[in-house]
Swiss-Prot record:
Belongs to the short-chain dehydrogenases/reductases (SDR) family. PROSITE patterns: ADH_SHORT (PS00061). This is Short-chain dehydrogenase/reductase homolog YusR. SUPFAM superfamilies: NAD(P)-binding Rossmann-fold domains.
Length: 129
């Protein structure tokens, strides 16, 4: 959270000078749904979403600020948790979890969107639907 704030504070003057720019913060669906099993994590991700929306208000119209809220992503974290992953996938509308490239492509598309700011976009195979 602090890292995102300080990073934005460092780049905003340069973006304002060029009258253009986009910031995309990465949170989590836990910041939207909450997570009783990991309350500090969920609270910190909710703060990321709040920072994103506040920056969007403060920096418009020159700078667009959006956020991505991934659900489960196929990473090394799942090693040794194959049964848990299989169970989770079975509960998702799309019956799959995102690949890291899926998240990266979404971030790139948000950077290119000239008419979008202040939004938190989930990429969670329908988990929060």
């Amino acid at each position: 959270m602090k890292g995102m704030f300080f990073c934005a504070r460092a780049v905003v003057p340069f973006m304002k000078k060029s009258k253009d720019g986009a910031i995309v913060n990465v949170g989590s669906i836990a910041g939207i749904t909450g997570a009783g099993s990991s309350m500090p994590y969920a609270v910190s991700k909710s703060a990321v979403h709040g920072l994103t929306k506040s920056l969007a208000h403060a920096l418009a119209p020159e700078i667009r600020v959006s956020g991505v809220a991934p659900g489960a992503v196929a990473t090394r974290w799942w090693a040794g948790r194959e049964e848990k992953m299989k169970s989770m996938i079975g509960s998702l509308l799309l019956q799959c979890i995102a690949e890291p490239d899926d998240v990266a492509k979404l971030i790139c598309s948000l950077i290119e969107q000239e008419s979008l700011t202040g939004q938190i976009i989930t990429i969670d195979s329908g988990q929060t639907l």
